[in-house]
A protein has these predicted regions:
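Extracytoplasmic "Venus flytrap"/periplasmic binding protein-like
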Residues: 1-9, 40-52, 153, 160-161, ...
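Hinge/lid segment of periplasmic solute-binding proteins
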Residues: 1-32, 97
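Short glycine- and hydrophobic/aromatic-rich loop-to-beta-strand nucleating segment
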Residues: 33-37
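Extracytoplasmic/periplasmic substrate-binding proteins
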Residues: 86, 127-174
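Short, solvent-exposed loop/beta-turn-alpha elements that line the ligand-binding surface or hinge
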Residues: 1-8, 93-124, 174
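Bilobed periplasmic-binding protein-like "clamshell/Venus-flytrap" ligand-binding domains
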Residues: 24-25, 66-78
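Glycine-centered hinge/linker elements that transmit conformational signals in sensory
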Residues: 61-63, 106-142
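Ligand-binding "clamshell"
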Residues: 20-22, 69-70, 172-174
Length: 174
């Protein structure tokens, strides 16, 4: 149908049109990427403010390790999709400030994973994960993680946080 026809039912329909004003698809959800965390675990570790920088996040994870029995950062590595899909979702505008970087510039960048030296880009993102692993701030055996089991674990205070999107909140509440 035309964008004008859809506009009365769908927000932002004008953003889903071709040059002739036709739309061939409808977005069905929105998602915010971030850290899903257990507030009680962070508080028990003495972390009273959410981390705002990579260094603050690593420090918070270390505090969880030092002051609780919880796994600071649960990677869900064995599931596979939780590593690529969730971490990679931060690439682009979130890590570079450039909304065109991932879909238009990434493939034309000579060294897209190089350290930009300013805390931005793919290197900075994956360095967070590298540092967490190197410092023992993830599960002991990441090859045996359990996606379904982690839902109860975070609710029971056995996990500090996980990199997930807002879509996961309802699953963790179940």
């Amino acid at each position: 149908g035309t964008v004008e026809e859809m506009d009365q039912y769908i927000n932002f329909a004008d953003q889903w049109k071709d040059a002739e004003g036709n739309s061939y698809g409808i977005g069905y959800m929105g998602n915010a990427q971030g850290l899903l965390y257990n507030k009680a675990v962070f508080e028990a570790a003495g972390v009273t403010e959410l981390p705002k920088t990579p260094d603050e996040l690593i420090a918070a994870l270390q505090a969880i390790k030092d002051n609780t029995d919880a796994i600071p950062l649960y990677t869900n590595y064995a599931a596979g999709w939780t590593m690529g899909g969730q971490w990679d979702a931060f690439l682009g505008a979130i890590t570079t400030g450039d909304e065109t970087w991932l879909n238009q510039k990434f493939v034309h960048t000579a060294e897209p994973f190089a350290d930009n030296g300013d805390g931005t880009g793919a290197y900075a993102l994956y360095k967070i994960l590298y540092d967490a692993v190197a410092q023992g701030l993830i599960e002991d055996d990441y090859t045996t993680t359990d996606w379904e089991g982690c839902k109860a674990m975070i609710n029971n205070g056995e996990i500090g946080c996980m990199v997930l999107g807002s879509w996961a909140i309802s699953q963790m509440k179940e």
